Curated annotation (Swiss-Prot):
Enzyme class, spelled out: hydrolase
PROSITE patterns attached to this UniProt entry: SER_THR_PHOSPHATASE
Catalytic residues as annotated in Swiss-Prot or TrEMBL: 122
Catalysis: reaction(s): O-phospho-L-seryl-[protein] + H2O = L-seryl-[protein] + phosphate; O-phospho-L-threonyl-[protein] + H2O = L-threonyl-[protein] + phosphate
Similarity comment text for this entry: Belongs to the PPP phosphatase family. PP-1 subfamily.
CDD domains found in the cross-reference section: MPP_PP1_PPKL (cd07414)
The protein's name: Serine/threonine-protein phosphatase PP1 isozyme 1
Length: 319
């Protein structure tokens, strides 16, 4: 995919910034196919455990909330102004999964060494067949295009480590995870299995009431307690686990005495929750701070400027 084509796609996807929220961008099917094929090549060449450097901005679930994705970039800076890591769950539930994933893939192609996207549990055919992405592809294009996305998703990396100290993934830890080398060795392309290391990295959840490992109410993977986090960090000489996968009221939430943080970047999730969204900025000393997308006022009230930016959260030193 040549540079002028990528630039043109990005320009059209960003044109709607000043339009009413929800305005669709209908790229051609061949453009989307090219986005998938080109990004798939780049993703496959990069490791399954990305080794990244601060400063970087980290974002949690987006779930097709394209207007909020644009707002995140307005606050954090549009690439290449800042380096980004997204933790997965780009599609399903929201109304504009296609615009969301297309912009992220386009930025991946344009800035392959500055823009990074991990796999979430929704970047999996058996899940996004049910929760909205398949239907959106079928309605706006065709089923064949959905299958092309599946091939691309099967090549997404599953974890990242920032400056050898902050381990990032979509879901959480796994009882099978003994060395980080195991993550590097997960083969790609691959579907997400029902059990095992890859499944846990995308599906597991922390639970303050659990010691060790517990059952997960989702019916998939496990929950893990604060003791599990502490032991894991000590064993691997890490400072922090950064994950997404759960709606949290303030857009970010600490666990296990600030040894783990959950990030969620889709405010007013599904229009049903009153949650904020957050992005976490990691500076070059590994200090973490948060930029918050506040939930909009209840419908019917006009809120100046939509989701306003609350002050960055208290900085958390990491070294």
């Amino acid at each position: 995919m040549d540079e002028s084509t990528v630039d043109d796609v990005i320009e059209r996807l960003l044109e709607v910034r000043n339009n009413r929220p929800g305005k669709q961008v209908q790229l051609t099917e061949s453009e989307i196919r090219l986005l998938c094929l080109t990004s798939k090549e780049i993703l496959s060449e990069q490791p399954n455990l990305l080794e990244l450097e601060a400063p970087i901005k980290i974002c949690g679930d987006i779930h097709g909330q394209y207007t909020d994705l644009l707002r995140l970039f307005e606050y954090g800076g549009f690439p290449p102004e800042a380096n980004y890591l997204f933790l997965g769950d780009y599609v399903d539930r929201g109304k504009q999964s296609l615009e969301t994933i297309c912009l992220l893939l386009a930025f991946k192609i344009k800035y392959p060494e500055n823009f990074f996207i991990l796999r979430g549990n929704h970047e999996c055919a058996s899940i996004n067949r049910i929760y909205g992405f398949y239907d959106e592809c079928k309605r706006r294009y065709n089923i064949r295009l959905w299958k092309t996305f599946t091939d691309c998703f099967n090549c997404l990396p599953v974890a990242a480590i920032v400056d050898e100290k902050i381990l990032c993934m979509h879901g959480g830890l796994s009882p099978e995870l003994k060395t980080l080398e195991q993550i590097r060795r997960i083969p790609r392309p691959t579907d997400v299995p029902d059990t095992g290391l890859l499944c846990d990295l995308l599906w597991a959840d922390p639970d303050k009431d659990v010691q060790g490992w517990g059952e997960n109410d989702r019916g998939v993977s496990y929950t893990f307690g604060p003791d599990t986090v502490t032991e894991f960090l000590q064993r691997h000489d890490l400072d922090l686990v950064c994950r997404a996968h759960q709606v949290v009221e303030d857009g970010y939430e600490f666990f296990a005495k600030r040894q783990l943080v959950t990030l969620f970047s889709a405010p007013n999730y599904c229009g049903e929750f009153d949650n904020a969204g957050a992005l976490m900025s990691v500076d070059d000393t590994l200090m973490c701070s948060f930029q918050i997308l506040k939930p909009s006022e209840k419908k019917g009230k006009f809120m100046q400027g939509g989701n306003s930016l609350a002050g960055a959260g208290r900085g958390t030193p990491r070294r």
